[in-house]
């Protein structure tokens, strides 16, 4: 889960990585829709045209209606772990989530498990649950999942899952989980500079280097079910 440094280190680095990959003709996908609540206008304002703007509005509103139809609020978001790590509100967490999209325009909005067909930044309908969201990314055609964390988790999706730490303490303590440490930004450097190192690392993963979770033999999957998933 996220912590107080996620929106300062790891998420901005992933956002800069996204911009870099898109500038080279690639595609990136942002999901975890409930974690966009409160910061969704940052994405809406970057939609390429009015049609995509309306699709983004529907993406957000449909997920809110999904919760309401089951008589549920967005419970435990931020989660207890998020709060212990320094996140106080949903908006705080959401502003961190949207940073992972960088600054590129939104080029497409995808339904759950819909295949990526457009270069650039895509938004995908899926919940905030780590494994469900990562499985949805894989189902939509993502070759690699970049997962930022300040609290740590050993999980992995069906595709190579690169675990990115927001703080050096986690990277040092769980070196068998964490692939890339963004905690160094607290002492030196910028997200743009570190994103180039992350880009090179992801190229290595795409070329056959195993992520820490692959070395451990972890390949998990979770399907979006009826009922509320945070």
Briefly describe each language-model feature range.
Residues 1-230:
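Anaerobic metallocofactor- and corrinoid-dependent redox/one-carbon enzyme cores
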């Amino acid at each position: 889960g996220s912590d107080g440094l996620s929106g300062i280190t790891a998420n901005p680095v992933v956002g800069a990585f996204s911009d870099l990959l898109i500038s080279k003709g690639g595609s990136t996908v942002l999901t975890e829709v409930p974690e966009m609540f409160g910061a969704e206008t940052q994405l809406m304002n970057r939609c390429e045209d009015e049609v995509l703007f309306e699709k983004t509005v529907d993406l957000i509103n449909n997920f809110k209606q999904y919760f309401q139809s089951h008589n549920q609020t967005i419970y435990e978001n931020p989660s207890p772990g998020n709060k212990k790590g320094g996140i106080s509100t949903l908006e705080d967490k959401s502003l961190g989530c949207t940073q992972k999209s960088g600054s590129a325009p939104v080029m497409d909005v995808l339904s759950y498990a819909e295949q990526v067909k457009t270069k650039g930044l895509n938004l995908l309908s899926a919940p905030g649950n780590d494994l469900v969201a990562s499985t949805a990314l894989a189902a939509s055609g993502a070759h690699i999942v970049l997962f930022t964390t300040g609290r740590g988790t050993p999980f992995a999706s069906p595709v190579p899952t690169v675990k990115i730490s927001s703080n050096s303490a986690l990277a040092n303590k769980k070196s068998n989980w964490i692939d890339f440490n963004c905690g160094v930004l607290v002492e030196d450097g910028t997200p743009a500079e570190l994103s180039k190192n992350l880009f090179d690392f992801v190229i290595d993963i795409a070329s056959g280097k195993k992520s820490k979770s692959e070395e451990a033999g972890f390949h998990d999957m979770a399907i979006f079910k009826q009922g509320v998933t945070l």
